[in-house]
Curated annotation (Swiss-Prot):
Gene3D superfamilies: Fe(II) trafficking protein YggX (1.10.3880.10). Could be a mediator in iron transactions between iron acquisition and iron-requiring processes, such as synthesis and/or repair of Fe-S clusters in biosynthetic enzymes. The keyword Iron applies. Keywords: Iron. GO terms for biological process: cellular response to oxidative stress. It comes from the Bacteria. GO terms for cellular component: cytosol. InterPro entries: Fe_traffick_prot_YggX, Fe_traffick_prot_YggX_sf. Belongs to the Fe(2+)-trafficking protein family. This is Probable Fe(2+)-trafficking protein. HAMAP family: Fe_traffic_YggX (MF_00686). One of its GO terms (molecular function) is iron ion binding. The lineage of its organism: Bacteria, Pseudomonadati, Pseudomonadota, Gammaproteobacteria, Oceanospirillales. It comes from Chromohalobacter salexigens (strain ATCC BAA-138 / DSM 3043 / CIP 106854 / NCIMB 13768 / 1H11).
Amino acid sequence: MSDTVFCRKYQKELDALPFPPLPGAKGQEIQQTVSKQAWDEWQALQTRLINEKHLSLLDPDARAYLMEQMERFLDNRETDQAEGYVPPSQ
């Protein structure tokens, strides 16, 4: 695996993930097409969604919802946001 990938979210070469973040073919696809930066940003959004929407990862519907939101995020489409979340000022 190379140290960089052409990131589908940012449309440029960025640092690669060191290992597939999910099992199976989906994890391999993500490792080959998503940068570490984009994955880290997705994980932060995922954490906010789980916490604010009180999602249980034991619930298949919640897992399907998160997979849908992940695809939307990585494809630069609109995603749900945690209610009341205000990003830190830069």
